[in-house]
Amino acid sequence: MTEEIIYLGKEELKQLMQTKLEKAGLQETHAKEVANHLTYADLRGVHSHGAVRVEYYSERIAKGGTTVTPDFKFEKTGPSTGVFHADNAIGHVAAKEALSYGMEMAKETGVGIVGVSKMGHSGMLSYYVDIAAQNDLVALAVCQSDPMAVPFGGTEPFFGTNPIAFSAPTNNERPIIFDMATTVQAWGKILDARSKNLPIPNTWAVDKQGEPTTDANQVNGLLPISGPKGYGLMMMVDVLSGSLLGLPFGKHVTSMYSDLSTGRNLGQLFILINPSYFTNLEVFKDNLSEMIKELHENQPATGFEQVYYPGELSEIKQAENEANGIPVAQSIYDYLLSDEVHYNRYDHSDAFAEK
């Protein structure tokens, strides 16, 4: 049976999440930024990275696995490169701070490449590349995650969902934004299905026997997109956001749930490009706007109403949710309203949140 869904205004949801995170121990400015990030995800229909995450974050914060007064340090290693040392702060705050250094270098030198070293989970990568595009930059972001995807031809999880996000500015109201896991689906989508008691497609994941499953509670390994192609991409992400920063790789990356009293030491990488160093900025943006226009004019295939550019459906969903309210599972809403910081559900679970 599916769970009841309620609809909240974005400011109400944002405030509920901020209050809970502050109660867990996060300082006000950090809690506000995380709540803003999670609201962005829920608005765009990516509920796997929205309010469903608050209880996990709160449990980790309360148990000491997130540095609540981090000693942030930016180490500039070259004219266009640097490493942001995050001190295992909550990743949403650390990654946004690191992004600002990268954007500054890209504005000055044409390119900015910043690695984020030793941080917590940073949420939805499209949040960051959206900011870059709003500042007239092209952006690529990659981030390692804990091992839950089986390699092509294998049966045991090795790499994470290892997402990739891309953005570019246009002369339209919104930029092009593309964000994807290198697995068929992100783990958070399965977590969202669990919270709503919904089945998943049998192409997303396998159980402990390596067989396809439709039960979100039986997932033991996620599948890479397009077999060997996704496998190669997730390895690339692991190299760029892990090994390149001297951090653990593959199956050695810490699990999200294994010990919530210690930092996760995750890595992330931003590559930011200033188009004006390669071409006229306005011509570049005009060309991308024309590209979108021509994609919209492409004859849709049977069963499709229109051809959309990558990420456009998220823009449409955001407009719908701003008008009609953000859908939230009743259990999540009840938790946000409760006096409980967390229900002690995640600590010492496996990668799939199972005890």
Question: How would you label these PLM feature ranges?
Answer:
Residues 4-8, 13, 23, 249-355:
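Catalytic-core signal marking the mid-to-C-terminal active-site face
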Residues 8-10, 26-50, 66-77, 261-265:
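N-terminal glycine-rich anion-binding loops that anchor highly charged ligand groups
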Residues 50-103:
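Active-site cofactor/substrate anionic-group-binding motifs, chiefly glycine-
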Residues 136-148, 242-256:
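Glycine-rich phosphate/pyrophosphate-binding loops
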Residues 149-216:
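Phosphate/diphosphate-binding glycine-rich loops and adjacent basic-rich segments that engage nucleotide
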